Structure formats: C-alpha cells, structure tokens
Amino acid sequence: LIRRSSAAKPHPLWSLQVMMDEPELVANVHRDFCLAGARVICLNTYSVTRHRLQMGSALPDLPELLKHAGDLARAGIQASGLSGIDIVASLPPLTASYLQQSPLSPEQMKDEYKELMELQRYHVDGFLAETLSSIAEGEAVLLAAQEADTGVHLAFTVQDEDGTRLRSGELLEDALRVCVPLKPLSIILNCSVPEAIDQGLPLLAVATKTFGA
C-alpha cells in the first residue's frame, strides 16, 4: 500500500526512505488500517536492521529510525480518533528476505535481535518476528526474546511449491520441534501463497494451540 501510494522509485531500502521523505504517507496508511478495523498495527521497520542499513547512505542511525517509525504509528492512531489499538515492532530477516541460509552466525543473529527488542520494548506493545526462512532464524529470535525477557510472535515463510518446508528447505515440522519449546506467543505462516499456507497450517495445529496465517 505504501509502495503504491509513494512517488519514490523502488529500491532495496525504499520502504525506509519513504518514511523519511514522505512521513505523512506512512502515518496515513497506519490511520487507514485503524479506520478499516485493525486493532494491531505493525511498525514500518521491516528494513531497519544494522546489516540492511549498510546498503544506504545519509540515513539516521538505528535508534533514531526505530523511534521515528514508532512516532508515525502513534500519529496514525491519533489521526484515526480510535483507542485500544496495539503497536507491534517488526523483527525481520536481518540481511535479506527468503535466504536459504543467513550469512550471520546464530550468536550474531541473537545479539542483533536482542538489540532491536531492547531499543523498542518501552515504545511498543509487542514484537512480531516475520518472514523467517530458517530454523536458525526462528531459534535466534526466540533465544533473544528470552534474554530480553519479552514475548514474541513468530512467523515463518514456507516454500510456495511445498508448504511443509521452510524457504531454507528445512521441514516445518522440524522448525516447530525446535521453536515450540522456546515458547513463542504464537506461530504464524506469512508471505507465502495461499495453497502453501493450507499445507502448513495443519502442522501448526498439531504443534501449538496459538497459530494462524
């Protein structure tokens, strides 16, 4: 929705850049989601990680960008005139989406996720780790949440041609075996075609009580 509304040309950090160049657009999108009935909105921070920021230049530092995203979400809620709407922070893949294997070590991933949580924990109502492609990413974010003493909703993306496997090729069943004991608030499937979601959801239903897509 932001991409369709913005005059900016797409590039690897376009969603971040539009937040700086057209902040009112991002706030208005949050407002419109609230007016459409959303009771939880997610910060526009999918590309705000230390490794992704290395692709850009003349950008504010990580804490400032995260704060700016939170301010825009709150402005959108205020503009809607509604109350009782929660804000969650995005915990994305740290380097790029849909990678079979992250170039970062498990310890590096855990530390960076923990930093993102600690920088935002007092400004949001929760955390959504989204579009994770591998067991290592899921385990890292959940271990980081334990160290940060906070909860996190965990969302995996699965292969379009086989919804029982993560984008990494690993079995979704194996991912659940590793991640469910680490007590995510919920486990979700996202950023996959509907047919793949249909294949994966029964595995979630067996493994955990709180799941969705």
Where do the model's predicted regions map?
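Domain-level signal for soluble alpha/beta catalytic cores
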Residues: 1-213
